Amino acid sequence: MSFPDFSASDAQIQWQRFCDLLWYHDDLGLWLDVSRMHLNASELEALQPAMDRAFTAMHELEAGAIANPDEERQVGHYWLRNPQLAPSDDLRTHIAREVDDIEAFGRGVVHGEIKAPSGVPFTDVLWIGIGGSGLGPALMIRALKNNNQGLPFHFLDNVDPNGMSNVLGGLAGRFKTTLVVTVSKSGGTPEPHIGMEQARLKLEAAGGKWAGQAVAITMLNSRLDQQAQQEAWLKRFDMFDWVGGRTSITSAVGLLPGALIGCDIRDFLAGAAQMDEATRVADSRRNPAALMAASWYVAGEGKGRRDMVVLPYRDRLEVFSRYLQQLVMESLGKRLDRDGNVVHQGIAVYGNKGSTDQHAYVQQLRDGVDNFFATFIEELEDSEDIPVIKNERPGDFLDGFLQGTRSALTEGGRQNMTITMRCFDERRLGALVALFERAVGLYGELVNVNAYHQPGVEAGKKAAAAILDLQQRVEEVLQDGVPRTVSEIRQVLDDGSDESIFWIMRHLTGNKRQYNAQGDWSSPAGMRFSKD
């Protein structure tokens, strides 16, 4: 397992290290270079027993073991791109049939064979989903959609009233030909439900027919699935209970957007499957996900002490850093390890795209606090329809900027790795996603956290529900029109906190809800609130 240690000052030693550590997949045309991370041979060797256990755990996960004990669930996103891995014949058949259905439906919509109830082809897609149900589709569209290819996409991925107004307002005049896709695993998540109700109101007011334009992606027999069945929606697709939102991009959640813009979704799945195969190799030096996970571990001392800065040098991948934020941070950001010890694990992720970032925060990366490692992503193949003007090729400049930033960071002792793709298409996107999925899974095993649950998210949902319940009771107290301070409101309720009630009243009075505020906003304890 010998290779030279990192050397910023000796180019020949560093070249040898580059050659020794470079990983390449010929069919995918994909390279991984971790030579500028500070991982050394003795550290990789010391990690090997833990990595062997991680390989075993990943093998058991793929074979159908309960990998999420909190919810007694299997974790099967790897089965989606290789149904033969699924633990039963019924499941293998179901997964394969689902891909066939998605492909056929997408083709029918794109080619105008599946029409809106008005009898004309669909013109737009309104996609309603939160978290992975929004980020995965957004990545698919931004990364793979070409001009005039498939249908335009519009996203409701939040409950911001202004954002919803802008998106829905932009569909004015086309609601009758808009395909509306609602994604909710349980069918009970508030954000997609609220977005769906707002979209339905606008669509029906414009003369559209909801059932003939609505598609659901949800678990079988969920609240949303039952509604879609009862109302005879246009189409329903499965969101399996063994697929988490952050790893759902190779399910209907990611495949349907791809199909609706005319992508080859089977190539996307094939790329993910190829990378899955490459990352099953039980030799860290020949396994790109293991090299990444080991590099992350050593860089952050096994405690997540360095952030991951994602720098893709392609506009198509500008959403990728946000996609990785959820994949990495929701998977690894845990208070407890599997043994119940308080560990506060995690890796913070941020980024945008090159070379834009060189004119933004790269200044700090080069000269500021050394608390990160960078991940460069590049594509070699340039678009042929951008001409050479005055002997200037945009792609040459982009490559020069990437190499220059990489060199500047390395000279400053800042760790970085680079993923290079010969070209970028559905297959490479699938491979890229699968590479990070496996690296996250292996790293989770190295630090002994459950990478497949999200108790913090659930805690946030419960806290939000409590606030909404408190708001309802605050409004009931104020029905009598008597002005009260927040403390007096709390005393009537015998519940809540003054600060929470103040936040609620500030929100209510900031909108046309017939609530009044008297007093000085800079002295909240003395403010009095009432209803007309």
Curated annotation (Swiss-Prot):
<feature type="active site">
    <location>
        <position position="461"/>
    </location>
</feature>
<dbReference type="InterPro" id="IPR046348">
    <property type="entry name" value="SIS_dom_sf"/>
</dbReference>
<dbReference type="InterPro" id="IPR035482">
    <property type="entry name" value="SIS_PGI_2"/>
</dbReference>
<dbReference type="InterPro" id="IPR001672">
    <property type="entry name" value="G6P_Isomerase"/>
</dbReference>
<dbReference type="GO" id="GO:0006096">
    <property type="term" value="P:glycolytic process"/>
</dbReference>
<feature type="active site" description="Proton donor">
    <location>
        <position position="330"/>
    </location>
</feature>
<dbReference type="GO" id="GO:0048029">
    <property type="term" value="F:monosaccharide binding"/>
</dbReference>
<dbReference type="InterPro" id="IPR035476">
    <property type="entry name" value="SIS_PGI_1"/>
</dbReference>
<dbReference type="GO" id="GO:0006094">
    <property type="term" value="P:gluconeogenesis"/>
</dbReference>
<dbReference type="InterPro" id="IPR018189">
    <property type="entry name" value="Phosphoglucose_isomerase_CS"/>
</dbReference>
<protein>
    <recommendedName>
        <fullName>Glucose-6-phosphate isomerase</fullName>
        <ecNumber>5.3.1.9</ecNumber>
    </recommendedName>
</protein>
<dbReference type="GO" id="GO:0004347">
    <property type="term" value="F:glucose-6-phosphate isomerase activity"/>
</dbReference>
<keyword id="KW-0413">Isomerase</keyword>
<dbReference type="Pfam" id="PF00342">
    <property type="entry name" value="PGI"/>
</dbReference>
<dbReference type="GO" id="GO:0051156">
    <property type="term" value="P:glucose 6-phosphate metabolic process"/>
</dbReference>
<dbReference type="GO" id="GO:0005829">
    <property type="term" value="C:cytosol"/>
</dbReference>
<feature type="active site">
    <location>
        <position position="359"/>
    </location>
</feature>
<keyword id="KW-0963">Cytoplasm</keyword>
<comment type="pathway">
    <text>Carbohydrate biosynthesis; gluconeogenesis.</text>
</comment>
<keyword id="KW-0324">Glycolysis</keyword>
<dbReference type="GO" id="GO:0097367">
    <property type="term" value="F:carbohydrate derivative binding"/>
</dbReference>
<keyword id="KW-0312">Gluconeogenesis</keyword>
<comment type="pathway">
    <text>Carbohydrate degradation; glycolysis; D-glyceraldehyde 3-phosphate and glycerone phosphate from D-glucose: step 2/4.</text>
</comment>
<comment type="similarity">
    <text>Belongs to the GPI family.</text>
</comment>
<comment type="function">
    <text>Catalyzes the reversible isomerization of glucose-6-phosphate to fructose-6-phosphate.</text>
</comment>
